[in-house]
Structure formats: structure tokens, C-alpha cells
Curated annotation (Swiss-Prot):
The gene is speE. Homodimer or homotetramer. It catalyses: S-adenosyl 3-(methylsulfanyl)propylamine + putrescine = S-methyl-5'-thioadenosine + spermidine + H(+). Its EC number is 2.5.1.16. It is an enzyme of class 2 (transferase). Disulfide bonds: none annotated. Pathway: Amine and polyamine biosynthesis; spermidine biosynthesis; spermidine from putrescine: step 1/1. This is Polyamine aminopropyltransferase. Catalyzes the irreversible transfer of a propylamine group from the amino donor S-adenosylmethioninamine (decarboxy-AdoMet) to putrescine (1,4-diaminobutane) to yield spermidine. It holds the Pfam family Spermine_synth. Spermidine binds at H62, D86, D155, S156, T157, D158. Keywords: Cytoplasm, Polyamine biosynthesis, Spermidine biosynthesis, Transferase. GO terms for molecular function: spermidine synthase activity. GO terms for cellular component: cytosol.
């Protein structure tokens, strides 16, 4: 009998992957966690039936959420990562020798434990000596921090369930306070294509705009995420990613599979329908 993983992108659209075997299924205090093995996408894991990471395309997401801010300000030393239990964001950050400290706050320890066992491709740098793991609510964590971080990356689930609090105005305001005077905030910004996801994207963008003087959106193609068209939010107290001297990034000699400095400029060029959504977030 064939086994398929199927995810509802809307009540009228489904996305399926043929599965060789299910490697893990469990429930934490926060969510259901499943790990599958497939020929097309390798090992992949889901939370509450929603795709989080696949071995085949994770490099796209993790390249774009990390290297865009790091190229914008190469002097980043202290980083806060919220969510990111699979470890891929931390893995990319540890490639920068100039980074001195990475605090990772993940509400669900079981996610990290499962990814350490089944997804070493992404979780293999969580033991880097610069990394400190905190298993607590990211919303509460940033409330008590002030003027500490050069970069905050919000690598969260979608804006419902355990990740819901990470899309509020209070949260973004606390992130602003936790950042130093030239700090950068980057977050996964949902998809603009399907209505439910677009609603979440517009709501988050509106709230970030209310907190930060520099507020931009960039995009990437991620095949296993709803519609494949995925957005990231870039907010900053000082740096505009389109005016930064990003060519210095090339001198680092980092080998990436997706990100490059030409793409850095191009990824901020958005389709008209997305630009119109972002311009009309106040309506």
C-alpha cells in the first residue's frame, strides 16, 4: 500500500509527497511532531500537519533568513534566534567566525530532540560553544531584554498555535527594545498567495512597520511551502539592505547553495500584487 503525506494549503488545495516510511510520531505539550522519509525530498518533519523542513529544500529558507541580514551588516556579533528548533538557522549563523554569541529560544524541547536524532543535516551545529539554548516562550524572553542584540531572527511556525504570540505588536515592540541602536530584525513572513496566509502576512507587516523606521520585504521560492512563494520581513533601526555594501560579503568566501549578492538585490523586487498588498496594509 502506498503511503502519502498530504497537507491542506487551503480547503480546496492539497499538497502531497509520497512517503517511504514514517520515522517518528509524537506529541509534546505544544504540538504534534512527525518525521517522514521520502525519495523526492529526503527526510522531512511536520508540526501539527504543516511542513517545516525537508532535507532537499531547507537550504533555500536557511540561506535567505540568515545571509541577507549578515551581508547587510557584517559586524553582527550577538544574535537572538526565536524558534528554529530544527537548527538550520543556527547552522548557517555558526559559519560566521565574527559572531560571538547565539541565543536560541525554542518553546518546545521535543522539537530540538527529534531534529537532533532525525535531521542532523540541520541540527549539527546546536552544540557549537557560542550557542546557548533556552527552552521557553520567545515572547516572554524578549520582554526582559534591552539593547543586547545586533540581530534577531524570528524563525517561527505560522501565526496560530504555539507561534501565535510571535506575530503581535507587543512582540515586535519588545524586539525593537532588545536590539542595539543599529539592530536588525528578520522574520519568516508567510506566503502572499493564498488568502489565509496573505492575511497573516499583512497583519505582521503592519505591526512591524509601526515599530521600525526601515521595513522591507523579500522573497524566495521554497517548493514545499504553500504556493512555493515565500516572503521574509526585514526591519531595522538603521540599515537598509538595498543600500548596504553587500559586496564585502563575497570576501568571506562562504559557499552557499542559494544566496548570492546578486540575488540579495533582486529578492527585494516584488511582484505588483504583493507590493499592492503591502502598500494597503493599513486599510
Amino acid at each position: 500500500m502506498e503511503l502519502w503525506y498530504t497537507e491542506e494549503h487551503t480547503d480546496k488545495v492539497r499538497f502531497s509527497i509520497k512517503v517511504d516510511e514514517q520515522l517518528y510520531s509524537g506529541k509534546s505539550d505544544f504540538q504534534r511532531i512527525d518525521v517522514f522519509k521520502s525519495q523526492e525530498f529526503g527526510t522531512f518533519f511536520t508540526l501539527d500537519g504543516l511542513m517545516m523542513v525537508t532535507e532537499k529544500d531547507e537550504f533555500i529558507y536557511h540561506d535567505m533568513i540568515v545571509h541577507v541580514p549578515m551581508a547587510t551588516n557584517p559586524n553582527i556579533k550577538n544574535v537572538l534566534v526565536i524558534g528554529a528548533g530544527d537548527g538550520g538557522t543556527v547552522r548557517e549563523l555558526t559559519r560566521y567566525e565574527t559572531i560571538e554569541k547565539i541565543d536560541m529560544v525554542e518553546i518546545d524541547k521535543l522539537v530540538v530532540d527529534v531534529c537532533r536524532e532525525y535531521l542532523p543535516q540541520t541540527a549539527n551545529k546546536l552544540d557549537d560553544p557560542r550557542v546557548s539554548l533556552f527552552f521557553e516562550d520567545g515572547l516572554k524572553f524578549v520582554r526582559s531584554v534591552e539593547n543586547k542584540y545586533d540581530l534577531i531572527i524570528v524563525d517561527s511556525t505560522d501565526p496560530f498555535g504555539p507561534g501565535e504570540g510571535l506575530f503581535t505588536r507587543e512582540f515586535y515592540g519588545n524586539c525593537f527594545k532588545a536590539l542595539k541602536e543599529d539592530g536588525i530584525l528578520v522574520n519568516q513572513h508567510e506566503s502572499p498567495y493564498y488568502e489565509e496566509y496573505a492575511r497573516g502576512m499583512k497583519r505582521a507587516h503592519k505591526r512591524i512597520k509601526e515599530c521600525f523606521p526601515v521595513c522591507r520585504v523579500y522573497q524566495a521560492h521554497i517548493p514545499t511551502y504553500p504556493s512555493g512563494h515565500w516572503l521574509f520581513g526585514f526591519a531595522s533601526k538603521k540599515y537598509d539592505p538595498l543600500n548596504a555594501d553587500i559586496e564585502k560579503w563575497n570576501d568571506l568566501g562562504l559557499k552557499t547553495k542559494y544566496y548570492n549578492t546578486e540575488l540579495h538585490k533582486g529578492c527585494f523586487a516584488l511582484p505588483n500584487y504583493v507590493k499592492e498588498m503591502l502598500e494597503n496594509v493599513d486599510e
